[in-house]
């Protein structure tokens, strides 16, 4: 298997995140990505390829995200930093809401409240470059599948499954998984996205919610107890043409592998019924029992069991894992 490594996977970004009212060091640290890369090369002996920054942005970036949102991400730091008392992180402290749904004043403070959906998604200098490094790796992995590879892995940082069409959330600004799925759909027609992160993949869900060519399946802890809190419920099944093509499988806190496998098997059966041409896996591992931001009870050895199941289901299709 080829592994495509984002050129920005080890940059020291982001800094801090507001989590349950406390400012903490962001969990998506460079050290984590460096350790994953070492395991890919030394333990799994994958063919690791560092992706070079593409000369042009892929068209799927603009198909998945709103133009005004992308413009904001590209220019936010420069505009924010012009203020003499600007912080080193762009962070919202006033937001649009039901009383003020539109922005009459287009200034850095109000724009941050419009496009950054929580306190855990700050922007820093070079953020735009870093995000696009992840996009390039996701697209490279998708292109490898299109070229005939049976499977491919993309090591991405920053992550993307919380990023919505025009809103950053959960430390995610650009929806890497959705961009890969969008690119693959043009070649294979039907794409399934399986998200195994402990947190609901709200961004991927929102982007494909009204489509029937992309099935989105998310296994996660109950939204009453875990981010993003406001979505990820089982009755969110899609709308319009996409009704029935979104599947959420929330689990109680403390769920161990025995209980997890029941939900996992349901997810695989739904994917089999959909009969996709390609499977994209958003592979978060914060279901691990000692993860400080999760609440499930999955152990290290359990991931091998899940991986083997994914290999078996991907036999009639192709498989791409997005981490």
Where are these regions (language model features)?
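HDAC/HDAC-like amidohydrolase catalytic core signature
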Residues: 1-194, 199-314, 318, 323
């Amino acid at each position: 298997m080829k592994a495509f490594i984002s050129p920005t996977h080890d940059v020291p970004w982001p800094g801090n995140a507001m989590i349950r009212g406390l400012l903490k060091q962001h969990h998506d640290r460079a050290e984590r990505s460096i350790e994953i890369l070492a395991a890919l090369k030394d333990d799994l002996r994958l063919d690791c390829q560092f992706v070079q920054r593409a000369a042009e942005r892929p068209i799927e970036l603009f198909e998945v995200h709103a133009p005004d949102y992308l413009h904001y991400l590209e220019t936010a730091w420069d505009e924010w930093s012009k203020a003499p008392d600007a912080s080193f992180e762009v962070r919202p402290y006033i937001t649009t809401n039901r009383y003020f749904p539109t922005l009459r004043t287009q200034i850095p403070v109000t724009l941050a409240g419009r496009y950054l959906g929580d306190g855990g998604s700050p922007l820093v200098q070079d953020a735009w470059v870093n995000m696009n490094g992840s996009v390039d790796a996701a697209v490279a992995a998708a292109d490898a599948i299109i070229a005939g590879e049976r499977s491919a892995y993309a090591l991405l940082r920053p992550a993307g499954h919380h990023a919505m069409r025009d809103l950053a959330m959960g430390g995610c600004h650009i929806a890497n998984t959705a961009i890969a799925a969008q690119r693959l759909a043009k070649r294979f027609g039907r794409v399934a996205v399986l998200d195994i992160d402990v947190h609901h993949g709200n961004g991927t869900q929102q982007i494909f919610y009204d489509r029937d060519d992309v099935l989105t399946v998310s296994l996660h802890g109950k939204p009453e107890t875990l981010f993003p809190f406001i979505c990820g419920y089982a009755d969110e099944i899609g709308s319009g043409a996409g009704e029935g093509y979104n599947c959420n499988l929330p689990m109680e806190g403390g769920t161990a592998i025995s209980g997890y496998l029941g939900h996992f098997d349901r997810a695989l059966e739904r994917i089999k019924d959909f009969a996709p041409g390609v499977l994209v896996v958003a592979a978060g591992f914060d279901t691990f029992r000692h993860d400080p931001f999760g609440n499930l009870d999955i152990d290290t050895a359990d991931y091998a069991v899940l991986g083997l199941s994914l290999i078996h289901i991907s036999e009639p299709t192709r498989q791409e894992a997005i981490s």
